[in-house]
Amino acid sequence: MDIKNNHSQNPHACAGVGCDTDGWSGLFNYSRREAHEVNVGDTPLGGDNPIRVQSMTTTPTADTEACVDQAKRIIEAGGEYVRLTTQGVREAENLKNINVRLREEGITTPLVADVHFNPHVADVAALYAEKVRVNPGNYVDPARTFKKLEYTDEEYAEELKKIEKQFVPFLNICREHHTAVRIGVNHGSLSDRIMSRYGDTPAGIVESCMEFLRICKREDFKDVVISIKASNTVVMVESVRLLVDTMRREQMDYPLHLGVTEAGEGEDGRIKSAVGIGALLADGIGDTIRVSLSEEPEAEIPVARHLVDYITRRAGHT
């Protein structure tokens, strides 16, 4: 195969990041994509900051002691952000207690609330966490039913207005409380609306994210991180590259969070994460990563750090 010709025919093969026009320098020289800086507590990401590593607690977020203990283990292992699942208002409100306990011990590591299905929970979490993750697939759209729905252009536009009506007040809360936002798309939870128009495709995954990013841009809300995750590493890599290219064409430079869902445990989980995350890091894409393993959360940190160090050591190498 003529690699040069193949690359030139595929505009998303590199998305203009981490390689030159002939597609070869990215194999030997790391060059990171430019992204604007996002403030997440006292640990900003993007810009000239190092690639941040993070993990996620597995303890019930309503259990303050368990969450604090596990967060400390993640932080002691080198985690720079700690994410906590936030299923309901009770869990969102308890983020305050977890945050206070850690700060009392002199720990300032930012906490990230992971919210699904309930916009009101995101509003509450934004009061107490340094960053809130929302999933476009279920933020306003109902839970996926796998039904084929038909929308006229007018009906589709009305659905987008519903998202904006709910999302803009959330952004205003985040702006007031200096809370960052992650727009985190999961391949497995695309809405029926997106699926009906775009199918189960990278284009649909990207559009699910872009709908929210366009609102952020209109509202001049810059403290946004984005992610696209899939258990299939090929789908993940293709979708993220397409997202980067789409943002470039729409003059956006939001930083990216990288991760592979359901990576597993042991050697298999590490290899799967290295394939998906490593390919994108080699492209110069990625400002924070989480290696998702079916193990204790602190076990994820050394793997993530090794992956980042391996790729970034190539900077300036010729």
Question: How would you label these PLM feature ranges?
Answer:
Residues 150-167, 172, 195-318:
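Catalytic alpha/beta core domains of metabolic enzymes, predominantly
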Residues 2-55, 171, 175-177, 313-318:
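N-terminal amphipathic alpha-helix/helix-capping segment at the start of soluble metabolic enzymes
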Residues 58, 78-102, 136-158, 224-233:
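Glycine-rich, proline-tolerant flexible connector loops at the mouths of alpha/beta enzymes
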Residues 53, 114, 183, 226, ...:
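Conserved, mostly hydrophobic/aromatic
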Residues 86-128:
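N-terminal active-site wall of soluble small-molecule enzyme domains
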Residues 31, 40, 47-66, 85-87, ...:
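Active-site mouth loops of central-metabolism enzymes
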Residues 131-138, 180-188, 256:
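Non-cysteine beta-strand/loop elements that form the S-adenosyl-L-methionine
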Residues 78-83, 128-145, 282-298:
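Glycine-rich phosphate-binding active-site loops on the catalytic face of alpha/beta enzymes
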